[in-house]
Amino acid sequence: MHSVEVVLDDESDRWIRRQWTALAEAGVPSQARHSADSRGESNRPHVTLALTSQIDPEVESRLRDAVGALPVPITIGGLLVFGSTRFVLARLVVPNAAVLALQAAVMAALPDGADATVDRHGTFAPGRWTAHITLGRRLTAADVGTAMHALAGVPRSRGADGALTRARRWDMVAKREHWLDPAG
């Protein structure tokens, strides 16, 4: 299984990491907890564009073409809470034409597109995808309240504008990242 992801500009990356840290310091599940595990630097703030079961050289070539429009400007929006029992806390990436076109191009490059065996909930299907940056997973309802308070103290030095700058695929089995852009 592979995910196709885009990472943030340096300032946005630092801001999200400060939020991860604030959550961890407040005792709330946070993506910061992955920093010390085997993923190391591969644990980066990112937006997942698609999931796929396999990526052969032909598909990787199509993906490289699909992400050719990077960098893409973004606005990082408010907090999102997904789930009903255990929650995912995330920051919205406000949809714009460039972000939606990038995600559609990546989906079109994949052989299984929105295959239900890969994307069980149709999360990445056209019109169903919600661009977001995960801050923490498996939060309780009480954790969500604590998180809101903790994140109120994490200012951003430059508004909400940023950019999606580079693309990678994450091999979930090998736990390895593969950059899809020329700088990778």
Task: Provide a role label for each language-model segment.
Residues 1-74, 98-158, 177-184:
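Basic, often amphipathic N-terminal segments
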Residues 4, 74-79, 90, 167-169:
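Generic structural hydrophobic/aromatic packing signal, biased to beta-strands
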Residues 79-84, 162-178:
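Glycine-rich beta-strand-turn "strand-cap" elements at beta-sheet edges
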Residues 85-87, 120:
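Charge-rich, low-complexity N-terminal segments
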Residues 88, 92-95:
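Hydrophobic alpha-helical segments that drive targeting, anchoring, or assembly
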